[in-house]
From Swiss-Prot:
Residues 1-66 form a transit peptide. RuBisCO catalyzes two reactions: the carboxylation of D-ribulose 1,5-bisphosphate, the primary event in carbon dioxide fixation, as well as the oxidative fragmentation of the pentose substrate. Both reactions occur simultaneously and in competition at the same active site. Although the small subunit is not catalytic it is essential for maximal activity. It comes from Larix laricina (Tamarack). Heterohexadecamer of 8 large and 8 small subunits. The gene is RBCS. GO terms for cellular component: chloroplast. It is found in: Plastid, Chloroplast. The lineage of its organism: Eukaryota, Viridiplantae, Streptophyta, Embryophyta, Tracheophyta. GO terms for biological process: photorespiration; reductive pentose-phosphate cycle. This is Ribulose bisphosphate carboxylase small subunit, chloroplastic. InterPro entries: RuBisCO_ssu (IPR024681), RuBisCO_ssu_dom (IPR000894), RuBisCO_ssu_sf (IPR036385).
Length: 189
């Protein structure tokens, strides 16, 4: 009995799905045309006072969507946290490294002459795709002063003047990289 009811209900469902629509092609979705402006929503004249207050407090970028631009990726290398800013002064570098040490992160230096992510040896991401830079010496376990880190930065910059140098802060308890920022750029960049 139950199986015959199941058979009847399943054939009815298939028939309903297979039946053509009388209004034409009603299941076609229109193409995405971007964000809409607030003009098609009800105006504050028809809304209550609470709705008008809410409308005044909110913002919409609907009218500005066509003004958005993409950051130019060519001849404009941007890397880590502070790379969009001008070069950091020595005082700013000291503050960044002190912040790293205050959080008990282990500083480490890495350098790379090209600095671009490139996949030369295959299409899949891996060790040789440019994300992993060469480590300068060993991570500075037990480092307590920013001057120690900056001395290593200066040594690395003397040895490799045409390289990008970044400081990385590792949390050895959680075993993750917590901070990374460029401390030296080649003169041509």
């Amino acid at each position: 009995m139950a199986s015959s009811i199941m058979a009847l209900s399943s054939t009815a469902a298939v028939a309903a799905v297979a039946a053509p629509s009388k209004t034409g092609n009603s299941n076609v979705v229109s193409a995405f045309t971007g964000l809409k402006s607030m003009a098609q929503f009800p105006s504050s004249k028809t809304m209550s006072n609470a709705g008008a207050e809410w409308e005044q407090k909110t913002t919409s970028n609907g009218s500005r969507v066509r003004c958005m631009q993409v950051w130019p990726p060519y001849a404009n290398k941007k890397f880590e946290t502070l790379s969009y800013l001008p070069r950091l002064t020595p005082e700013q570098l000291v503050k960044e490294v002190e912040y790293l040490l205050k959080n008990k992160w282990v500083p480490c230096l890495e350098f790379e002459e090209d600095g671009e992510i490139k996949r030369v040896y295959g299409n899949s991401p891996g060790y040789y795709d440019g994300r992993y830079w060469v480590m300068w010496k060993l991570p500075m376990f037990g480092c307590t002063e920013a001057s120690q880190v900056l001395n290593e930065v200066n040594e690395c910059a003397k040895a490799y003047p045409n390289a990008f140098i970044r400081v990385i802060g590792f949390d050895n308890v959680r075993q993750v990289q917590c901070i990374s920022f460029i401390v030296h750029k080649p003169e041509y960049n």
